Amino acid sequence: MRTATLYRYSVPMEAGVILRHQRLKSRDGLLVKLQQGELSGWGEIAPLPEFSQETLDQAQVAAECWLQHWVSGVESDDSVLPSVAFGLSCAQAELKQTLPLSADYRKAPLCTGDPDELFAVLQALPGEKVAKVKVGLYEAVRDGMIVNVLLEALPDLTLRLDANRSWSRAKADGFAKYVNPALRSRIAFLEEPCKTRAESREFARDTGIAIAWDESVREADFQVEAEPGVAAIVIKPTLVGSLARCQQLVQQAHQAGLVAVISSSIESSLGLTQLARLAAWLTPATVPGLDTLDLMQAQVVRPWPDSPLPLITTEQLGVVWHR
């Protein structure tokens, strides 16, 4: 016999979490639990405002429709809504025990630009010293100076940068101007520096700073292929879709000689632990981009190892659907 439950969570965020144009005050999402006999599986459905094509309410309607079929014994195709497809495919994979349990809890720490603070964090990191810096929120020149300071201060540091398509070509050049050419090879990649792919390609060609595709991966005309200056693709499963789709993208990236990075869309601790398992399975040689839990004030159902944040249990969540 099959049963399914859909829970809704809302976790307060730390002050100062800004998406593209708005402050994120709480992270809201759905958790799905599938039960079949003695086996169960969980998944998270949490569209990210400003980044997901669907709203949480739309995701809930689609999830309820899929679950109604599932409890009746009907196997439906993946939802066309990426967050729903991802959450339901995780729940199914756990139920069928096809999502490996081993996890990669390494994370590229999100860095605010203070070298002393980052130095302390990196000293405690095992192995590869990789950190991520969000650029494009302030002046491009300031970003360039900060990146340069970090690379100079920490000789074994590699940086991943993310601009979210926020720069014109002129601003991107302003950033590059302040990064010493001798240090640029330690920028693993800069995600989508410019507003268009063509400008980003030209930027990589002219500056020698490698780029990665992020937003582009979710666009209908995108194809994974080797290109000069392109080092990686960033895969955010909540925005991309099912586990099968993520697996396909990773395989295509590796065939093209590109790095594939599994990355967070600010999921709860439950979703993050599943992303850590996905990364250990599909991209074991690459540090995933999962350092977002500390943006929240609580964990949900499943804890992240060694996190001091309080844990919200299943009993504390609201049930929005059950059959």
UniProtKB/Swiss-Prot annotation:
It is an enzyme of class 4 (lyase). SMART domains: MR_MLE (SM00922). The keyword Metal-binding applies. Pathway: Quinol/quinone metabolism; 1,4-dihydroxy-2-naphthoate biosynthesis; 1,4-dihydroxy-2-naphthoate from chorismate: step 4/7; Quinol/quinone metabolism; menaquinone biosynthesis. Keywords: Lyase, Magnesium, Menaquinone biosynthesis, Metal-binding. InterPro entries: Enolase-like_C_sf, Enolase-like_N, Enolase_C-like, Mandelate_racemase_C, OSB_synthase_MenC1, OSBS_N. GO terms for biological process: menaquinone biosynthetic process. The active site is at residues 134, 236. Mg(2+) binds at residues 162, 191, 214. The keyword Isomerase does not apply. Gene3D superfamilies: Enolase-like C-terminal domain, Enolase-like, N-terminal domain. Its EC number is 4.2.1.113. It comes from the Bacteria. It catalyses: (1R,6R)-6-hydroxy-2-succinyl-cyclohexa-2,4-diene-1-carboxylate = 2-succinylbenzoate + H2O. GO terms for molecular function: magnesium ion binding; O-succinylbenzoate synthase activity. Its cofactor is a divalent metal cation. NCBIfam families: menC_gam_Gplu (TIGR01927), PRK05105.1 (NF003473). Converts 2-succinyl-6-hydroxy-2,4-cyclohexadiene-1-carboxylate (SHCHC) to 2-succinylbenzoate (OSB). Belongs to the mandelate racemase/muconate lactonizing enzyme family. MenC type 1 subfamily. This is o-succinylbenzoate synthase.
